[in-house]
Amino acid sequence: MGKSELSGRLNWQALAGLKASGAEQNLYNVFNAVFEGTKYVLYEKPKHLKNLYAQVVLPDDVIKEIFNPLIDLSTTQWGVSPDFAIENTETHKILFGEIKRQDGWVEGKDPSAGRGNAHERSCKLFTPGLLKAYRTIGGINDEEILPFWVVFEGDITRDPKRVREITFWYDHYQDNYFMWRPNESGEKLVQHFNEKLKKYLD
């Protein structure tokens, strides 16, 4: 097996150490461990999109109607701050990701426990402008997949209403989100990436 092929295999043995340390339910810990010695790298709070909105050129008639402070827009951070990004350092393709932790309606709780809106805030990722930017910057142009991955955590992952809601939103793009349920292993998270998403980075 060649060096390049080896670098494309995830370090599954690293998960054993995480189980022992109790760090297995932290996405950053999990992927930093399994990516060690591979061609994949995890960025925490990546900066690739930090100035995205400042680059928008507005029409003159709009400029005349809004406040225009005397600042250098190139120094601003008017953009998007994903929670993580995964890059294949050979192809330079990038998958941007969000972590949405939210309460939910489960055994012993009232239905009102599912009233949070973290999951709704993730809907901005479906907007035409961000889809285009994520594809351009990340290099994932295959239309059978979206250029982002959302990992849901907490009791929302077992809420009968919210799970149906999210399933409906993603329609035939079910691979673009993962319900990381409480006490579920990091192995399941990595398995989803490995089987459903990694091929779009290769």
Curated annotation (Swiss-Prot):
EC number: 3.1.21.4
InterPro entries in the cross-refs: Restrct_endonuc-II-like (IPR011335), Restrct_endonuc_II_EcoRI/MunI (IPR011336), Restrct_endonuc_II_MunI (IPR022725)
Annotated Pfam families: RestrictionMunI
Regions annotated as coiled coil: none
One MF annotation (Gene Ontology) recorded for this entry: DNA binding
Reaction catalysis annotation: Endonucleolytic cleavage of DNA to give specific double-stranded fragments with terminal 5'-phosphates
Keywords, alphabetical: Endonuclease, Hydrolase, Nuclease, Restriction system
Listed GO biological process terms: DNA restriction-modification system
Enzyme class: hydrolase
Domain of life: Bacteria
CDD domains: MunI-like
Subunit structure: Homodimer.
Protein name listed in UniProt: Type II restriction enzyme MunI
